[in-house]
Amino acid sequence: MSREAMYDIVRAPLITEKATALSEKNQVAFKVAIDATKPEIKVAVETLFGVKVLGVNTLVQKGKTKRFKGRPGQRSDVKKAFVQLAEGQSIDLTAKLV
């Protein structure tokens, strides 16, 4: 799998209160492609960040129905991945990628 394909799978880090609290438990949260599978996410994170991944949990957050100019519309669904890292490993999301 090419690095470009991996960047298509792992879209962005998820910076929320929950994600920050999970960092104490050696977990990191990412927004990922809606069609990405757990094995693909694991390989992409291990390759891009140079860490050992123990497990991946995913969820799909359904898009909200919103109104625009009086007409109902739908926001896009978002897939989130919570990645469990091996003991003693971490990812610095503020530094540049490997």
From Swiss-Prot:
BP GO annotations: translation
SUPFAM superfamilies: Ribosomal proteins S24e, L23 and L15e
InterPro entries: Nucleotide-bd_a/b_plait_sf (IPR012677), Ribosomal_uL23-like (IPR013025), Ribosomal_uL23/eL15/eS24_sf (IPR012678)
An annotated Gene Ontology molecular function: structural constituent of ribosome
Pfam family, any one: Ribosomal_L23
Keywords: Ribonucleoprotein, Ribosomal protein, RNA-binding, rRNA-binding
GO cellular component, one term: ribosome
NCBIfam families linked: PRK05738.1-3, PRK05738.1-5, PRK05738.2-4
Family per record: Belongs to the universal ribosomal protein uL23 family.
Assembly description: Part of the 50S ribosomal subunit. Contacts protein L29, and trigger factor when it is bound to the ribosome.
Reported function: One of the early assembly proteins it binds 23S rRNA. One of the proteins that surrounds the polypeptide exit tunnel on the outside of the ribosome. Forms the main docking site for trigger factor binding to the ribosome.
Record protein name field: Large ribosomal subunit protein uL23
